[in-house]
């Protein structure tokens, strides 16, 4: 699973928290448009600009997945 770190919540303060990790859902069409699909604070999945996040390196994402599965 891919994880993203929010680095900017401008225009979305109720939906995104800066410095919070979000699960990236697979959406190839969104990626072609420079967007990412995540589950935000509402608990629903929405599209956001890719520029609001940085991708967590896979090795750290694997550790996050393992920690959450315990």
Question: Model-found features: residue ranges?
Answer:
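C-terminal structural segments of small proteins and small subunits
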Residues: 47-70
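Basic/aromatic-rich interaction segments and small domains that mediate binding to polyanionic partners
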Residues: 3-12, 17-48
């Amino acid at each position: 699973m891919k994880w993203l770190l929010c680095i900017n919540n401008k225009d979305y303060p109720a939906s995104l928290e800066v410095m919070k990790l979000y699960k990236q859902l697979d959406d190839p069409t969104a990626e072609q448009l420079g967007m990412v699909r995540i589950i935000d604070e509402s608990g629903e999945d929405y599209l956001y600009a890719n520029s609001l996040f940085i991708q967590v390196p896979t090795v750290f994402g694997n550790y996050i997945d393992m920690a959450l599965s315990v």
